[in-house]
Amino acid sequence: MFSKKITALALVSAVKAHGTVSGIVADGIYYDGYNPSYQYTSPAPVTVGWLIPKDLDNGFISPAAYTTSDIICHVDAAPAQIEAPVKAGGKVELQWTPWPVSHKGPVIDYLANCNGPCETVDKTKLQWFKIDQVGLISPTAETSGLWGTDVLIANNNSWTVTIPSDIATGNYVLRHEIIALHSASSVNGAQNYPQCVNLAIKGTGTAKPAGVSATSFYTPTDPGIQFSLYGTLTSYTIPGPALYSGAISVTQTLPAAPTASATGVYTVS
């Protein structure tokens, strides 16, 4: 039974796979991301990435589901049971499975304070503030333009985000997302790939930015959601709330080798 389940999973993934975060590097320490195949192992690995066992095809959330809880951290996502420690002002690298070149679009990052343990947080109560966004970089650099996803691919399918240095110590969820626009010219054609990671952030800051619910981020007809990737491009409006004033931009470069690996930590006090 075990081998049959794994074989079925492999076949589905081969046909429909797009991408998922397979690894996280927080302040130079590597952590495994979640893989849906873990549900077929005993004991299942404990990861800092949120659990998405129903995402068997590494699939997406469509605009039709923007008002449902699936847009928060992916389909039927459940909180990770450990957290990766990172300093305020530190860097978190998200390592994706190989991303398709044709799936161009923005890369966006949000944070939400769990106001307690993230392991037991009600995801529908999380209030998110945007800390990073890269959309259309150059409309004429290549066919369909140069996008955040192209930079991600060029950086070994990885993306680095800096944690704002002014935020208060606490337990947070990092929501990292790619929005693929290759079919977005029609309503419900955009493809959202949200991935969530538990972080234990420590610093000297006191800021507690206001946020919004993920179910209010986007609508199916937002100009950055229903968008034609093909033809003459002039501009692109990145969807979602405004960027947090304390956000720190990152110049994406080829990632450095992790200094160590770990399985995660439990909640910081």
From Swiss-Prot:
Its main location: secreted. Its EC number is 1.14.99.56. It is an enzyme of class 1 (oxidoreductase). Lignocellulose is the most abundant polymeric composite on Earth and is a recalcitrant but promising renewable substrate for industrial biotechnology applications. Together with cellobiose dehydrogenases (CDHs) an enzymatic system capable of oxidative cellulose cleavage is formed, which increases the efficiency of cellulases and put LPMOs at focus of biofuel research. InterPro entries: AA9, AA9_LPMO. O2 binds at residues 182, 191. It is found in: Secreted. Binds 1 copper ion per subunit. Its cofactor is Cu(2+). Cu(2+) binds at residues 18, 103, 193. It catalyses: [(1->4)-beta-D-glucosyl]n+m + reduced acceptor + O2 = 4-dehydro-beta-D-glucosyl-[(1->4)-beta-D-glucosyl]n-1 + [(1->4)-beta-D-glucosyl]m + acceptor + H2O. Residues 1-17 form the signal peptide. It comes from the Eukaryota. Induction: Expression is not induced in cellulose-inducible conditions (in Avicel- and wheat bran-containing complex medium). GO terms for cellular component: extracellular region. Lytic polysaccharide monooxygenase (LPMO) that depolymerizes crystalline and amorphous polysaccharides via the oxidation of scissile alpha- or beta-(1-4)-glycosidic bonds, yielding C1 and C4 oxidation products. Catalysis by LPMOs requires the reduction of the active-site copper from Cu(II) to Cu(I) by a reducing agent and H(2)O(2) or O(2) as a cosubstrate. Belongs to the polysaccharide monooxygenase AA9 family. This is AA9 family lytic polysaccharide monooxygenase I.
